């Protein structure tokens, strides 16, 4: 994803607070079930990856919980928003908490910024939380 910078901005000039706000906004969009707006945060060609293992570095040659391009993210969004999504009856309420936000590396050549964070997700359903 591209965080808080226009094509004319060098990533090294993006304030740390803007990076944090970007991640907080992402969490809020998910909690508010604004999945289309969340999907719009991705840069063209951006991938959504949830590694299966904590130390997994490669999403292609190893199993992942999710590794989705734009089309597959849209399929997921359509399924979650569909009236027949029985697994979402009643719909989940979530709380995403983002912390430990760090700039892991900056690549001036490609104008890319790599940011890491920790997050937790709490989900509430009519039968309790998990």
Which residues fall in each region the model found?
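A beta-strand edge to alpha-helix "cap/lid" segment located at domain peripheries
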Residues: 3, 95, 102-130
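A solvent-exposed, acidic/Ser-Thr-rich amphipathic alpha-helical stretch
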Residues: 44-113
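A sequence-composition feature that detects small, non-aromatic residues
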Residues: 3-4, 18, 27, 43, ...
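Short, low-complexity N-terminal intrinsically disordered segments enriched in polar/charged residues
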Residues: 2-44
């Amino acid at each position: 994803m591209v965080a808080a910078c226009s094509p004319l901005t060098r990533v090294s000039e993006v304030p740390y607070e803007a990076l944090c706000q970007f991640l907080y906004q992402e969490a809020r969009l998910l909690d508010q079930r604004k999945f289309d707006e969340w999907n719009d945060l991705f840069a063209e060609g951006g991938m959504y990856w949830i590694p299966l293992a904590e130390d997994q570095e490669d999403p292609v040659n190893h199993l992942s919980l999710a590794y989705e391009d734009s089309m597959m993210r849209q399929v997921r969004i359509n399924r979650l928003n569909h009236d027949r999504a029985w697994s979402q009856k009643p719909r989940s309420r979530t709380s995403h908490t983002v912390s430990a936000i760090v700039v892991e590396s900056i690549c001036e050549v490609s104008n890319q910024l790599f940011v890491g964070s920790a997050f937790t997700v709490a989900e509430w359903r009519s039968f309790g939380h998990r």
